[in-house]
Regions:
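Metabolite-binding pocket within alpha/beta catalytic cores that recognizes anionic/polar moieties
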Residues: 25-158
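Non-catalytic positions within long, well-ordered alpha-helices that form the structural scaffold/packing
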Residues: 104-107, 204, 223
Length: 317
């Protein structure tokens, strides 16, 4: 990846966006994006050196929160809190397009996402991790493409995550004492309500292994941005296909779920630290993900205005 110098001032434009907060920085070498929740972000912040927050303007509005850029060891990372400060954004309100566009604008070519899920399988136990390899998208209120209104773009999604980065995560998990499932199908629902029992049983019948609300359209937009994307699912509980113990009160169930989520977050942090400390290649310009738009634009290029081409030029880098 080439070195990009970004001057964060209100006067200096960078691909029609502005960065603010902090002094000038140079994005040296590889910058790995991480998208996750507040717990993971707080833990990473304690380990980052030379950390700065960056506000990034995009054609799709502001991302969920300022992006925290810094270093862990020899790796530079850019962390984005998906739900915003204080977990204020419901899944349907997350500005997924702005989040992915902002990451790409900063020079991120690889993103590792993380997020809480419910388990649809007895063998996937709360507190464990899953490196997701497939999705079933049930969302219906979210913008799932950057190209609305001026171009038709059909990206391949048969293999919806980067197998190369996913394998790096799987290999790293073998080095540490963290139970990590090497594959799993994630059913992404709109929310914010949880499933009915009938829906949960249906999702199991479809072949789903996990149920969550945040992976889509994040993975689709990452593919449109030509970003290598992998996802670590943090299992917080069993979904309602599996009845809870009749004598358990709601408060104790919630405490149990939060404890499971904290355990999974700690495991995810350990896995990410292992990956960042390793020598495996996280960013590769030769990866097929980096060429996902090569044959995807079906609209006659002459019919796309210069302004629209300039607006989304970042996606083609």
């Amino acid at each position: 990846m080439c070195v990009k110098k970004i001057v964060p001032s209100e006067q200096r434009d960078y691909h029609k966006g502005r960065l603010t907060h902090g002094s000038s920085i140079t994005m040296e070498g590889e910058l790995v994006g991480i998208i996750g929740g507040t717990g993971l972000g707080d833990a990473l912040a304690q380990r980052l050196t030379d950390a700065k927050l960056h506000d990034v303007d995009t054609p799709f509005g502001k991302p969920s929160a300022p992006i925290m850029v810094g270093a862990i060891g020899q790796k530079r990372i850019a962390f984005l809190n998906r739900h915003g400060k204080g977990h204020k954004l419901a899944p349907s309100e997350v500005p997924f397009a702005a989040n992915i566009f902002a990451m790409k604008k900063l020079g991120v070519h690889t993103v590792i996402g993380s997020g809480a899920v419910g388990s649809l399988r007895e063998e996937i136990v709360p507190g464990e991790l899953v490196v997701v390899d497939q999705f079933i998208d049930k969302t219906f209120r979210r913008i799932s493409t950057f190209f609305t209104g001026f171009a038709v773009v059909h990206c391949e999604m048969a293999e919806p995550v980067c197998s190369r980065v996913s394998q790096v995560l799987i290999d790293a998990a073998k080095e540490i004492d963290v139970m990590t499932h090497p594959d799993g199908t994630y059913v992404c629902m709109e929310g914010p309500q949880f499933s009915s029992r009938a829906e949960s049983l249906m999702h199991r019948g479809w072949g789903g292994d996990l149920i969550g609300m945040t992976a889509m359209p994040e993975a689709k937009l990452a593919r449109e941005a030509q970003i290598c994307y992998a996802l670590i699912a943090l299992v917080s509980d069993y979904d309602c296909w599996r009845p809870h113990h009749a004598k358990k009160v709601k408060q104790s169930l919630l405490q149990e779920i939060m404890a499971n989520l904290q355990a999974a977050t700690n495991n995810c942090l350990k896995l990410i630290e292992t990956v960042l400390a390793g020598e495996a290649e996280l960013v590769s310009e030769d990866c097929p993900c980096r060429k996902s738009l090569e044959l995807a634009v079906w609209t006659d290029k002459s019919q796309i205005s210069a302004a629209d081409k300039k607006k989304l030029a970042v996606l083609f880098e």
